């Protein structure tokens, strides 16, 4: 594949929608699952793959997506308990990754995006294809930054991979205002 990954792994839950979406009513919607059950499934992958670093969403799920918040919560538990033989005892040999990182959007990127949106007559409190993302509320929350990765050298590869992900905007994510700002910051 485009990214050269050794594997892609799924937890076999159904995608939820943003708050208020009918998709959230599905019994297999990720955000509706017991957090410890999801954490046990994540522990299975941690123990099997033995990563040095575990990466998950920030505590607000990037843009307040219920699934992103749910997987954040489960991943934090899994990271903390992957070396506990009592937690998920059938999930393989215990293992402790060295570090846990959260992906978070650059607040400077969000602030510039909001200014540009207003300049072009767009409402930053109604972002996204469903107009259900409030960039102002996201920019108001900040998290400590412990590591930054400049992706300019791999931005074209990241964009190509993003074009394959139709449910996340596909080609639309590299067009228009977001694409312009993303290329300027090197953060698509």
Residue ranges with predicted function:
Residues 21-24, 28, 32-188:
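Metal-dependent de-N-acetylase/amidase catalytic core
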Residues 2-20:
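A conserved beta-strand->alpha-helix junction
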């Amino acid at each position: 594949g485009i990214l050269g990954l050794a594997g892609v792994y799924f937890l076999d839950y159904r995608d939820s929608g943003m708050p208020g979406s009918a998709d959230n009513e599905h019994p297999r919607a990720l955000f509706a699952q017991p957090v410890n059950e999801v954490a046990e499934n994540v522990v299975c992958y941690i123990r099997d793959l033995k990563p040095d670093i575990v990466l998950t969403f920030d505590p607000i799920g990037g843009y307040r997506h219920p699934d992103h918040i749910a997987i954040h919560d489960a991943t934090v538990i899994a990271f903390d308990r992957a070396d506990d033989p009592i937690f998920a005892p059938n999930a393989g040999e215990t293992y402790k990754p060295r570090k846990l990182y959260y992906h978070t959007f650059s607040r400077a990127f969000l602030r510039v995006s909001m200014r540009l949106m207003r300049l072009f007559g767009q409402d930053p409190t109604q972002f996204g294809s469903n107009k259900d993302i409030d960039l102002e509320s996201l920019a108001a929350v900040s998290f400590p930054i412990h590591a930054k990765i400049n992706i300019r050298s791999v931005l074209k590869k990241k964009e190509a991979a993003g074009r394959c992900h139709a449910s996340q905007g596909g080609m639309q994510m590299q067009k228009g205002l977001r694409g312009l700002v993303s290329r300027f910051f090197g953060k698509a």
